[in-house]
């Protein structure tokens, strides 16, 4: 069986992937932390073979490091590669030909990675589909700021365009209740020559935020897991502190149709907001979500299923992997954070 390599930005999903697969197969598992704030990770015996922590300011530096690392390891078969951060997806995409020679990939093709890891590009792409989406504008100039003030319904959400801008701005999502709040935030960000995205806020609490995580095979077969982000921390900021599985056939059909249309093959996740019975596309990840563990809890273990597929194992997914509803996931690392939340 093939070994597993995870290029990680955070611990939770990366360790979950290794644990899920290592519990079934006596293989070697490797975690490469990329530009992570994790200084040292002591893993339970037998679950993770090796961990390294790299700082790489560019894709070229990353490629030099992993090329050297790969040459020092002997793999009997091509290892299966998982990326658990936007940055690792983008870095791998830049050297995809080399990675396809050295690994079995679980990420989608480069066009999907490049579009959906940039919220400005993804907004343009979504408008060409049948998906509903909140009114959105990429803010590049003072005129764009004024356009939002005149044409958008408040409150609005501002968010960075990609992972690089998120580091500069310092937040994933910020809700602006008033025009004055929006103006203050927007002019402050734009003064630093940082472009960002503005969206109309879709009404509804955390329990109206839905997740749809999936693995789509090359033949079009999809195994999925869906449910509600019943608690976000901080509130309304997108980070799921607690979730519950809950199948919704309408949402499943919407998601599956969309993934088929764009030709998605690999692991990923989509966030939706429910309002008045409709589902609005918020964003998509081209990698396992940080809460991928919930798929194990729901008995649809997506990383393991991707591993089965990489090893060409025959699966009857309709019988083997049926989501169990009302299964709860709790991210204790978020629950224990103390930070003021939006009322």
Where are these regions (language model features)?
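ATP-binding N-terminal substructure of ATP-dependent carboxylate-amine bond-forming enzymes
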Residues: 1-108, 143
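Active-site nucleotide/adenylate-binding loops and adjacent lid/helix of ATP-dependent enzymes
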Residues: 115-197, 206, 218-219, 249
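Phosphate-binding site of ATP-dependent enzymes
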Residues: 179-235, 246-256, 273-280
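Conserved metal-phosphate-binding beta-hairpin within the catalytic cores
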Residues: 260-293
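Flexible, glycine/charged-enriched surface loops at secondary-structure junctions
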Residues: 265-270, 316-322
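Internal hydrophobic alpha-helix adjacent to the cofactor/substrate pocket in enzyme cavities
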Residues: 303-315
């Amino acid at each position: 069986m093939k070994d597993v390599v995870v290029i990680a930005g955070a611990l939770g999903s990366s360790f979950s992937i290794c644990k899920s697969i290592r519990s079934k197969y006596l293989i070697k598992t490797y975690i490469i932390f990329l530009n992570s704030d994790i200084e040292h990770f002591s893993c339970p015996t037998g679950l993770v073979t090796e961990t390294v922590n790299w700082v790489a300011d560019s894709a070229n530096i990353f490629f030099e490091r992993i090329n050297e690392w790969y040459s020092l390891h002997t793999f009997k078969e091509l290892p299966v590669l998982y990326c658990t951060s936007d940055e690792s997806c983008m870095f791998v995409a830049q050297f995809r030909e080399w990675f396809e020679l050295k690994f079995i990939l679980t990420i989608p093709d480069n066009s999907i990675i490049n579009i959906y890891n940039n919220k400005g590009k993804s907004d343009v792409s979504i408008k060409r589909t049948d998906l509903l989406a909140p009114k959105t504008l990429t803010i590049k100039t003072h005129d764009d700021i004024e356009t939002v003030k005149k044409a958008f319904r408040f409150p609005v959400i501002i968010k960075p365009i990609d992972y690089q801008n998120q580091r500069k701005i310092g937040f994933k999502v910020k809700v602006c209740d008033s025009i004055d709040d929006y103006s203050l935030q927007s002019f402050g960000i734009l003064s630093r020559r940082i472009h960002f995205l503005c969206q109309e806020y879709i009404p509804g609490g955390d329990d109206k935020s839905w997740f749809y995580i999936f693995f789509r095979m090359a033949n079009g077969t999809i195994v999925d897991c869906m449910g509600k982000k019943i608690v976000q921390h901080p509130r309304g900021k997108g980070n799921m502190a607690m979730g519950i599985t809950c199948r919704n056939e309408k949402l499943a059909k919407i998601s599956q149709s969309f993934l088929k249309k764009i030709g998605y093959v690999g692991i990923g996740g989509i966030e939706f907001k429910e309002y008045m019975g409709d589902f609005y596309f918020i964003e998509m990840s081209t990698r396992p979500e940080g809460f991928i563990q919930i798929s194990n809890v729901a008995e649809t273990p997506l990383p393991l299923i991707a591993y089965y597929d990489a090893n060409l194992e025959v699966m009857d997914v309709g019988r083997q992997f049926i989501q169990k509803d009302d299964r709860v996931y709790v991210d204790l690392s978020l629950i224990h954070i103390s930070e003021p939340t939006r009322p």
